[in-house]
Amino acid sequence: MYKRQEHYEAVIQNYVSVDVIAQTADFSRYKVIIAPMLYMFLPGTADKIRIFIKNGGTFIITFYSGMVNENDLAFECFPPFALNDVFGIKAEETDSLEDSDENSFNWEGKTYKVKRYCDLVQLYGAEVMAVYEQDFYAGLPVLTKNEYGSGMAYYMAARSDVDFLRDFYARVLCDTEISQIVKSEYVKDVMVKERCDKEKQYVFLMNFSRDSREICGETLKGYEVKILEKYL
């Protein structure tokens, strides 16, 4: 089963604040929107995504996106529905792998595994960032990006792992100048959250390991939580 939570986990491991929103939400409040496996498009969703990207937003979708309408009826076109020109690709078919099967791709000098779902996409103007390395679709795009208007549209054609997602989202967050809650690379088992009022920022450092961890000059004992305060 595909777990959208993997994307959430990867983003919060970059120590940024995250909202979980619906398709009906106001997209204009955000600089980056990640919509993994957005299988069903509600009426108006495609237009909202198009406008968001055109106006300078960064939008990321994956395989199995834009396939059916609100009645679970398939669109009569290649996914993602009404957005082939925006994302610069057409997803023509999906190879569903057995649990024991894997593929791989190389991105920025590092090899990552692919599992379960592999879209076979044709380029429609997008730039290829990585390609499959095995099987009959070796050489086909697995990760693409496409400039549209003032924004950027990314397409992930396959399911990878949290390690890749964390690395990839780190790059996207850097490119879009989204600030970290704390300036730090990921520390295993440490979660960082923030809350703010009119005067202060409260940063919660939480260690979910029995072993001690260090982050931002702070040492956390096993399962310890520290709260840092800073005036805004």
Q: What annotation goes with each model-predicted range?
A:
Residues 1-232:
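Carbohydrate-binding surfaces of carbohydrate-active enzymes
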